[in-house]
Amino acid sequence: HKHLSPTHPDLLTVIVPRHPHRGAEIAEMLRSDGADVAVRSNSEPVTPQTMVYLADTMGELGLFFRLAPIVFMGKSLVPAGGQNPIEPARLGAAVISGPHAWNFSEITDAMVAHGGLEIVADGNALAAAIAADLADPGRTQARAHAALSYAEHESKVLETFIDRISPHLDAAERKRDAGA
């Protein structure tokens, strides 16, 4: 946010911690760094001065993925394994990840190949990627569309698999029931 706000003064960064109970700790860390923070669990409103909206509540991640045109997947700039990029892809966001998303390497590799995910090396590269997205909405929309297309394709693969094995499962169940 610090790198981008001079050229994008209306920018609002939304942080959704994986562990909402860390909300107060994260808010304090951000405030000590000079950020104006609104905390969702405290019902603090977003004002024109708000720099960061800390969505430290449960069950609303999809809402923020749908609202955000650009989503950065946490735990991926540090060696922590990353997070699954499929959910923001399904909800129409342009997805960015760091290089340490090994927990989801097959998905991230495939999404990169489809143009639906951008990998950045570090915080400076993340700021540059977001700046490029903000400067070129067509770039952002193209990556979001590619991410959604990939996610929909993967959903169809699962549906096809289920359609193909269901008759066999049904036959096995009938056979088991007949022998019982």
Regions found by a protein language model. Give the residues of each.
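Nucleotide-activated sugar donor-binding and catalytic core shared by glycosyltransferases
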Residues: H1-A180
